[in-house]
């Protein structure tokens, strides 16, 4: 099939003017299909003639039938028929409604004849858009490889019929919509036309009186909110970007969890996680959704085998289902989770021709397993769903109640907000609903990840954003001059990032103030720099490998690796500041400043808008060894490796390497901080040896081998997404914490509770964690252990919260309320573990954490808190050979009767400190 660009050239060959009939008032066309493209567009951006493809065939759509009867348009009509023909000898049939077209074609030497109906002997069929009896035949004719030339207007038809839903009832739309082209009831202006040399843009937004409010109301009938609070899942956020797609459940930040869309003759509903198919509170909505998808046909509802729980929920509401492994030919609705082998073409045609699709899936786990690969481009669910105007993103949403759109209120939608952004940017005035511009920026950046090459529906958005952002200089966000996120300037930062990552020309994105770390000031090396990178990864997850190189901002770099490395699933990452700030009210830096991409070719060009340290992301179990990496456009950055870098070499690097960020590394920890702070370190060796001692203690308590298979990372940033520090890979902290990380004397005298707290968070395992109670508690065991065993700082001095009088008061307050897990959190929860440690030492913890870590997946540890807590009681009791059930009961733990009975054979723990508390506790 020819590309839209090539097709446009063929259709416009020799066309020098649009001489349309003066007394004909056409309608505006709406284009949503990935194969659809505009041909004739007026000066206000309305599409009047378009083309598309469906199945093996093609269609050309005119917004008034008179366009197909106008002899002055003979050049275009001849081109259209020629493009629609599958071969030069294909027969052309013309419906009697377009009889004059036969003579126009004949005058140009093209034979055609009147045919009352489309049939298989024809290669092209020409008809107006008002025929109600032939719609199914016309769709199948095109699908099998036929060419369709169709014209009509819907605004007049709308005034005459009983059904005012033009998009879904107008006869022409029952045909052309399968290819993503719709006749609307908007009148089109015919005062001025320009013959385009290149394909014109598709408008961002076509406003139709025929909106989707009836569909939304039907789906949400009787629904107050969509509550998934206790669903035990984190759904993916949905990007709703199609003109006929609409959100159904939104959080306070306008993040969408469930959405629906019309596509062709069919309908789609998407949830951000398959678990939502099993949530009892969503039962009424699930019933509404399946009935809406069925469209009143009372047809066969097919549920994918893996989702059989949904069948039970639907049965309660009187809907019978058929459980099948795949879509069946007689299905009316198909409920499923898309996997790697999803039949994209089959399912898209199923919907286009009237089927209903109910999809549940999340993409954040796929994104975690595939760093540097956009889920919008490669996630199996999105290969199917992008075309429907709904995409699954890697951003997760917190489980909770999601509000539903209310009648008469405006709801955030990417396209409508982008259209308003366009108006504001053009006029420098306007008003958008609160929070919409803060959402537009990241949504736009996400949308730009959808592959757009030769897909006009997406290319038009790229072109618009390039045009808008090239008119104005990019804001520069700093701590001294922050940028408000929910405004045009904030949106520009995210949109510029998306454009840069999509390959747009960086010369269009000029900042208000030139960054001192941009290529203009840092001046990358004229010759390429080659470094050797260790690409062996014995760990169980991907890891970053430092290169010691920094990429200046607003730069395109060329990266080269050997052929063997290009096929090893390596990724390139520019930048280490991974926190997503899109929900921050003020921005001290761009909201998303790293760029990841696949290193899938021996030589690759990569765009860098913000600059940053360069890393290779190495997949788990990689055994590549040392890989030579050659980079053109980089500068060197200070990098110190314990045991490898000499003191003299370190001094030289600080003097000669201009990179503004540097790293201090051991085999177990890597600290990333500004170079300005590193200049205070004449000799990092004592500091890093201390860090290695602390990391050894962290590993020992957690039952982990040492040296670590992969080093932990701590990165300082001008702004992070949450808290003073947070765990993860990497651990993130504020710039104010840098001295705490790199000042050995300070560490030895005052300790460093915060960083070790986050290292402890990274040690937590779901098998022995009881969220939310212990989330901020058990990690502090590592703080106490490291401070006491490595730094020699007792717990009472390491943190004021562990001063003995404070601890005792906390326990008594807890007991005075009646011991209950409901109140057992944070420092109170930690006290339980500290009492055990003070009685039995650290060894039981070390042995127990090791035992948990070494458990095989076949042992199937419990997943709910009550069972996990009882397992902990049993295992700790066995470790210390004491019956600890009474101790934990005193703390209000939900000890199961059978567990208490099973531990009765063990000796009583006579020194149980909780006995003393209970004996001396004032009655409450």
Swiss-Prot record:
Transmembrane segments: none annotated. It is found in: Cell membrane. InterPro entries: Class_I_gatase-like, M60-like_N, Pep_M60_3, Peptidase_M60_dom, TCAF. Its main location: membrane. Residues 542-841 form the Peptidase M60 domain. Keywords: Cell membrane, Membrane, Transport. GO terms for biological process: negative regulation of cell migration; positive regulation of protein targeting to membrane. GO terms for cellular component: plasma membrane. The C-terminal region is necessary for the channel activity stimulation. Interacts with TRPM8 (via N-terminus and C-terminus domains); the interaction inhibits TRPM8 channel activity. Interacts with TRPV6. Positively regulates the plasma membrane cation channel TRPM8 activity. Involved in the recruitment of TRPM8 to the cell surface. Promotes prostate cancer cell migration inhibition in a TRPM8-dependent manner. Belongs to the TCAF family. This is TRPM8 channel-associated factor 1.
